[in-house]
Amino acid sequence: MYLEQVKTELFEAQDVLNKFISNEQNIKLIQQAALLISDSFKQHGKVLSCGNGGSHCDAMHFAEELTGRYRENRPGYPAIAISDVSHLSCVSNDFGYEHVFSRYVEAVGQKGDVLLGISTSGNSKNVLNAIEAAKAKGMKVIALTGKDGGKMAGLADVEIRVPHFRFADRIQEIHIKVIHILIMLIEFEMAKIRQ
């Protein structure tokens, strides 16, 4: 009944991934982002992550794998997804939804920390505001974007962009792969100081 559609979806996902992998710069940027976060951890910094919708779920998944466990038994790492419901509802009500992430960065972020901002369009106003707040605090910024990078293009210290223009879910599929690789590389890098 839907077998051909299933195959078409899987082949399209594979095509987007292959195009992303074929750009060697993407591979280098993933490594650069992982080292940026690891360097922050080594200096007693932390990573904050944020996004909307599916990207919010990715931001939470990223943080929980770092504080919890990914593939290796190791110490937890200082990662916080900006996802506290009481904070989000308070700031949304009092200041507006476009400030939910930036207010948290202003309150908790410190020089030497890292912000991971995730937006498939690169145009999420609340993530853009968080980037601005992070830069004002002397934090490093990593952005996971899609399409042409939107308004986030050029704002981050490291931008990992999935140049796909059809559906956001295809971009999110690459983002979650990137997130898993970041965590793996962070584990590798942090293991060096435990040896």
UniProtKB/Swiss-Prot annotation:
It catalyses: 2 D-sedoheptulose 7-phosphate = D-glycero-alpha-D-manno-heptose 7-phosphate + D-glycero-beta-D-manno-heptose 7-phosphate. The keyword Membrane does not apply. InterPro entries: GmhA/DiaA (IPR035461), Phosphoheptose_Isoase (IPR004515), SIS_dom (IPR001347), SIS_dom_sf (IPR046348), SIS_GmhA/DiaA_subfam (IPR050099). Gene3D superfamilies: Glucose-6-phosphate isomerase like protein, domain 1. Belongs to the SIS family. GmhA subfamily. The reaction produces a racemic mixture of D-glycero-alpha-D-manno-heptose 7-phosphate and D-glycero-beta-D-manno-heptose 7-phosphate. This is Phosphoheptose isomerase. The lineage of its organism: Bacteria, Pseudomonadati, Pseudomonadota, Gammaproteobacteria, Pasteurellales.
